C-alpha cells in the first residue's frame, strides 16, 4: 500500500489560524491565540504530516486521515511524559549543557524553587506531556530547616512557585504541563540518609524533618 503525498498549504494554514477556522486553534485550552500559537500551529501541521508519511505505515496513516480513528498529538515529534530526580537537581544544580547558562546547587528554599521552575520549563520544550518531580516535600524539607523558615515564608515561596509554573512560557503561549507529588511522611529508604545541600552533607537526616514536611504540605 502506497500512501498519497500531502502537501501543506502555507497560505491556507496561516489564514485558517488567523480566522480560527482550523479546529486545532481551540484543541488545547492551555494554548493562547497568539503569534506563538500561530507558529506552533503551522509547524505542527508539518510535523503531523511527517509522522503520517514517514513514520507510520500507510495502513496506520490512511485511517487517521479518513477519520476512522484519531492519533493524538501528531504535531509533537517527541516523547509524552517524563519524571525527573528532584534529589539530583538539588545536589547538582541546573546545568550540564555546554554553552548554556548553568547554576550551582541551590542553598536556600527560594533558590531551589527557582531552579525547579527553570528545569521543568526548559525540559517541557523537549516533551509533549507532563514533566514531574516526586517526593517534593521530602527533598525540600532540608531547606526549611537550614533557612529556619516560618510558615508564612514557606507560603510565599510556594505561591511564587505555583504562579511561575503557570506562566505561559512554553512554545505556543502555553504554560508548562507539570506534576509535583508529595510523600506526606518520609519514605523508609530515605529516613536515615543525610541530605547533600550546597555541596555539603548536613548533620540531620530526612527522617528527622517531619515538622518541616508538614509545613510544606500545609503551605501547598
Show which residues each predicted segment covers:
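Catalytic alpha/beta active-site cores
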Residues: 1-220
Amino acid at each position: 500500500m502506497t500512501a498519497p503525498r500531502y502537501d501543506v498549504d502555507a497560505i491556507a494554514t496561516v489564514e485558517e489560524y488567523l480566522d480560527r477556522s482550523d479546529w486545532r486553534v481551540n484543541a488545547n485550552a492551555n494554548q493562547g491565540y497568539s503569534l506563538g500559537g500561530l507558529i506552533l500551529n503551522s509547524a505542527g501541521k508539518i510535523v503531523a504530516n511527517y509522522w503520517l508519511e514517514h513514520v507510520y505505515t500507510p495502513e496506520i496513516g490512511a485511517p487517521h486521515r479518513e477519520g476512522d480513528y484519531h492519533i493524538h498529538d501528531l504535531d509533537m515529534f517527541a516523547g509524552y511524559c517524563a519524571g525527573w530526580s528532584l534529589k539530583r537537581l538539588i545536589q547538582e544544580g541546573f546545568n550540564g549543557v555546554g554553552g548554556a547558562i548553568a547554576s550551582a546547587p541551590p542553598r536556600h528554599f527560594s533558590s531551589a524553587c527557582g531552579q525547579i521552575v527553570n528545569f521543568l520549563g526548559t525540559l517541557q520544550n523537549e516533551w509533549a506531556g507532563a514533566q514531574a518531580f516526586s517526593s517534593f516535600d521530602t527533598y525540600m524539607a532540608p531547606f526549611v530547616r537550614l533557612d529556619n523558615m516560618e510558615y508564612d515564608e514557606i507560603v510565599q515561596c510556594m505561591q511564587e512557585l505555583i504562579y511561575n509554573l503557570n506562566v505561559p512560557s512554553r512554545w505556543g503561549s502555553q504554560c508548562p504541563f507539570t506534576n509535583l507529588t508529595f510523600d506526606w511522611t518520609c519514605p523508609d529508604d530515605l529516613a536515615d540518609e543525610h541530605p547533600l545541600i550546597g555541596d555539603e552533607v548536613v548533620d540531620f537526616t530526612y527522617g528527622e524533618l517531619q515538622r518541616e514536611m508538614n509545613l510544606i504540605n500545609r503551605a501547598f
